[in-house]
């Protein structure tokens, strides 16, 4: 099976055999077009028309993102493979089994996933969500003034068909885990990036969109002096607001937000920006607003994949040295930021204030998403992470981490 999803992808038809127009004729095919759509192919490389039509329509109408289209395509493709192996659907053409399938067959499929394939309830629910969207938004609903492809009853009129998945505790990267990850690399650039991702609560897809200008603007905020009640001297803020061009907007759109980053972390980033290598590589970009805040060893932009590889490499090293007890994914850094915000005593007057801060800085649309971090009661969590000690501030922890792990960047060191 193969799934392809594109949004606004340029296609050049200048050399295409479809453009066999006489010089005097009006061209029937444009020289270049931009394409948005999706296609799902089976193992024999045959197009699955129903699935592909649904995903293309949803992409073209900005109903789903590219990643969602790929996930849906795979899930629906897996379901189709299961159906084609059942006796009653073996004569069906490509994905036409979806036009005949009944509720009990879908329920048997989910039971097969749990019992034979031993998939988790969460994974089964993910397949269920894809099927429900396929039936509700396409098969049983006409689109573009066309009648619905399916005339049989909708099996999803009552909602999900799979059991509700159990709620698992969020597994986060602790401050000690972060320290060991940082110590597992001898590149100050990589150390700086790991601390920044944790402190800013970034998704891996958001890192390439953080610009040099955003860092500079955030640091200008620290030049502002603040007067606190009962304190006569003006002080600099320990945190600076940083603009993030966030992910998870509708249909691949950017979802801007402000996050709070410790001043110590931003100062560490600026020292990296002062390195000869970063200064040399940033010349290829026009202006600070177009210059990525982090560049790889070759001067290119980080990608989702390269960030995952960085975490995989540093986690493996730390695991082999018995410094950590689990692999740390990029998203675990983001979870660690949430817990750090919830336990820091200098943001908000109470726990609810800090929970709202988590929602805003992580870019959650709904507060109940942020509440996943409250499955462990706050007072118990404090005792678990700091038995018998008083809580440090997040800013203080980041300052201490920078001091303990920062490497000097020499002019001749190309890291």
Task: Kindly give the residue locations of the regions a language model identified.
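Short, basic (Lys/Arg/His-rich) helix/loop patches that form interaction surfaces
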Residues: 300, 308-356, 360, 364
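Catalytic-site neighborhood detector that most strongly recognizes the C-terminal catalytic loop/helix
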Residues: 362-393
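Conserved tyrosine-mediated DNA breakage-rejoining catalytic core shared by Y-recombinases
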Residues: 210-267
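DNA breakage-rejoining catalytic core of tyrosine-based enzymes
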Residues: 157-179, 237-239, 251-263, 285, ...
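N-terminal core-binding DNA-recognition domain of tyrosine recombinases/integrases
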Residues: 51-68, 76-166, 180
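Basic, Lys/Arg- and aromatic-enriched nucleic-acid-binding interface segment
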Residues: 176-204
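Active-site/catalytic core of tyrosine-dependent DNA strand-transfer enzymes
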Residues: 260-324
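C-terminal secondary-structure termini that scaffold catalytic or DNA-interacting sites
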Residues: 1-13, 388-415
């Amino acid at each position: 099976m193969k799934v392809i999803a594109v949004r606004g992808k340029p296609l050049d038809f200048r050399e295409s055999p479809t453009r066999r127009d006489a010089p005097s004729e009006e061209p029937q095919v444009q020289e270049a077009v931009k394409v948005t759509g999706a296609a799902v192919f089976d193992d024999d490389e045959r197009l699955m028309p129903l699935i592909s039509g649904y995903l293309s329509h949803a992409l073209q109408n900005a109903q789903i993102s590219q990643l969602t289209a790929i996930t849906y395509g795979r899930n629906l493709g897996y379901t189709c493979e299961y159906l084609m192996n059942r006796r009653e659907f073996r004569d069906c053409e490509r994905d036409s089994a979806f036009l005949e399938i009944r509720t009990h067959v879908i329920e048997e499929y989910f039971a097969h996933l749990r019992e034979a394939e031993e998939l988790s309830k969460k994974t089964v629910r993910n397949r269920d969500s894809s099927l429900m969207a396929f039936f509700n938004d396409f098969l049983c609903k006409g689109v573009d003034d066309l009648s619905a492809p399916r005339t049989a009853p909708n099996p999803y009129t009552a909602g999900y068909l799979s059991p509700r998945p159990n709620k698992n505790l969020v597994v986060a990267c602790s401050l000690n885990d972060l320290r060991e990850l940082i110590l597992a690399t001898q590149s100050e650039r990589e150390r700086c990036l790991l601390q920044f991702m944790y402190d800013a609560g970034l998704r891996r897809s958001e890192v390439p969109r953080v610009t040099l200008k955003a860092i500079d603007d955030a640091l200008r905020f620290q030049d502002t002096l603040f007067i606190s009640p009962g304190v006569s001297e003006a002080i600099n803020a320990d945190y600076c607001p940083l603009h993030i061009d966030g992910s998870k907007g509708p249909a691949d759109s950017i979802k801007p937000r402000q996050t709070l980053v410790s001043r110590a972390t931003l100062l560490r980033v600026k020292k990296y920006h002062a390195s000869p290598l970063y200064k040399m590589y940033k010349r290829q970009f026009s202006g600070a607003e177009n210059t990525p805040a982090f560049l790889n060893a070759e001067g290119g932009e980080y990608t989702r994949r390269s960030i995952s590889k960085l975490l995989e490499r540093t986690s493996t090293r730390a695991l082999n040295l018995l410094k950590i007890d689990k692999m740390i994914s990029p998203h675990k850094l983001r979870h660690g930021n949430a817990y750090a915000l919830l336990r820091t005593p200098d943001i908000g007057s109470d726990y609810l204030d800090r929970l709202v801060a988590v929602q805003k800085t992580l870019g959650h649309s709904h507060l109940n998403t942020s509440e996943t971090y409250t499955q462990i009661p706050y007072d118990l969590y404090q005792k678990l992470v700091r038995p018998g000690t008083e809580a440090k501030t997040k800013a203080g922890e980041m300052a201490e981490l920078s001091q303990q792990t920062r490497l000097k960047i020499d002019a001749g060191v190309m890291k």
